[in-house]
Amino acid sequence: MPVPILLVTGFLGAGKTTVVNHLLAHAEGRRIAAVVNDFGAINIDAELIAGASDGVVSLSNGCICCSLEGDLLRTLALLLRRDPQPEVIVIETSGVADPLDIVRNLMDPIIWREAPLETVLCVVDATVPVAMLDDALLRSQEIGRAHV
C-alpha cells in the first residue's frame, strides 16, 4: 500500500519544526516517519523534534532540493523498507530550499509508486511580509505552489 508524503516547506523561522512537532505529538497511534533537512552541518531542527527517535531521519549539511537529492531518495527507499512501514512520511525542508525541485525529485516513478506526494504545506509567518525577505520572488512562488 502506498505511503503518502507530506512536504512541509517555508522560509527560515516560519515555524516548520513547530508544525512537524504538532503532527508527531498528535499522531494518535499512526506511524509517522519524519525526514528533517537543515542546510547547516548540524541539524538543529532534528534536535528540536519532540521525542526524536528512530522515526526521525536527519539530512544535514546541504539542501534536499539540490546537493542532497540523492540522499533524500535513498532515505525514502530505506523508510519504505522498514517493518512496520510508516503510514505517513513527513519531509521538512530547510528554510532555503526550493520546493519545486524537491517535488520534481519526488516524482521519480519508483518513489511515486510507493510514496506519492500527497500534500505540499507551506508554513508562513504572517508577521513577516514576503516582500521583506531576501528571496521574495522564490518565497512568493513557494506559497503559490503549495496545496495548503
Descriptions of predicted regions:
Residues 83, 143-144:
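A short, aliphatic-rich alpha-helical micro-motif
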